[in-house]
């Protein structure tokens, strides 16, 4: 069996609770082959691992959310097909998002992120969103914010995906998008384990952030909610550590029947002399 662990901002780059849990889990299954799909901010972390990888880790794939699409910058621009444009518009307006069409667009076609983000189709879809929800804002600011929001998601859409029997995402967010896309492409199973609730953590960060103001905070938060809802919908099983976290997952769109609460284990024998 081949298992792909999909992790954002932790293993194998950073030491921490989630990273240690992943490392221990891999070592507990020495006869299972693991592949790591690790998401980092940029290439400064390339190959800089905080852990010595176990022998049953066969490959590590790295995705950088702040990567730049220079290699295809000067390709001839092409308009999207009607189905592709409808899917793009559904994503931006968050109206019955056609994720699988978008996965196929970026995985099966030689598209340039620059051409998508700077093209007429993206402009038209953003304009529709602006007119429906945000016409009180300055349009140029809104447009560039939307480009900033969708660049890391579109980079994620283009990621080369290792084939595996099971994709285990240790958060929703971009990891959940990758797992959902891999499920669509390979027909594999998807498992999501949340130690913290990704959407709530990003929401708290954005509320405190100085780099984004006013209603733009809400637009970013909605983007993370959208991605998390995808992961919940596509997963076969979603785990959380306690009941309150389970309730948050339900509020964020996870079907209750998919959720299992798996509290952190305690070695009782270590406490018997207390």
Language model segments and positions:
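N-terminal subdomain of nucleotide-sugar transferases
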Residues: 1-126, 130
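Active-site proximal beta-strand in glycosyltransferases
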Residues: 3, 166, 183-210, 214, ...
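Histidine-centered beta-alpha loop that forms part of the nucleotide-sugar donor binding/catalytic region
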Residues: 8, 39, 194-197, 263-264
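Short N-terminal targeting/anchoring amphipathic segment
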Residues: 101, 158-176, 185-191, 195
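An amphipathic, basic-hydrophobic alpha-helix
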Residues: 141-166, 176-178, 226
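Membrane-proximal helix-turn-helix segments that form the acceptor-binding/catalytic region
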Residues: 153-163, 197-198, 215-238
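Carbohydrate-associated surface elements
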Residues: 244, 265
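Acidic anion/phosphate-binding donor-loop and adjacent secondary structure
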Residues: 250, 256-257, 266-274
């Amino acid at each position: 069996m081949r298992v792909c662990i999909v992790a954002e901002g932790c293993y194998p780059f950073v030491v921490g609770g989630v990273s240690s849990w992943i490392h221990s889990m891999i070592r507990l299954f020495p006869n299972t082959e693991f592949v790591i799909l690790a998401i980092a901010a940029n290439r400064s972390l390339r190959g800089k691992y905080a852990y010595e990888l176990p022998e049953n880790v066969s490959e590590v794939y790295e995705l950088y959310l702040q990567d730049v699409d220079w290699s295809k910058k000067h390709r001839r621009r092409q308009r999207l097909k009607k189905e592709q444009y409808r899917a793009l518009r559904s994503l931006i307006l968050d109206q019955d998002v056609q994720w699988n069409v978008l996965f196929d667009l970026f995985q099966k076609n030689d598209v340039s992120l620059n051409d998508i983000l700077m093209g007429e189709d993206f402009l038209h879809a953003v304009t529709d969103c602006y007119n429906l929800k945000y016409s009180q804002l300055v349009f140029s600011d809104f447009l560039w914010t939307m480009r900033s929001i969708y660049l890391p998601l579109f980079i994620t859409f283009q990621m080369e995906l290792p084939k595996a029997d099971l994709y285990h995402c240790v958060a929703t967010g971009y990891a959940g998008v990758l797992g959902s896309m891999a499920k669509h492409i390979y027909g594999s199973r998807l498992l999501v384990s949340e130690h913290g609730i990704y959407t709530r953590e990003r929401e708290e960060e954005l509320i405190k952030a100085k780099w984004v103001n006013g209603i733009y905070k809400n637009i970013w938060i909605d983007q993370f909610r959208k991605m998390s809802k995808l992961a919940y919908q596509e997963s076969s099983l979603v785990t959380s550590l306690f009941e309150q976290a389970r309730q948050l997952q339900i509020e964020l769109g996870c079907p209750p029947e998919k959720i299992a609460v798996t509290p952190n284990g305690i070695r009782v024998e270590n406490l018997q002399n207390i």
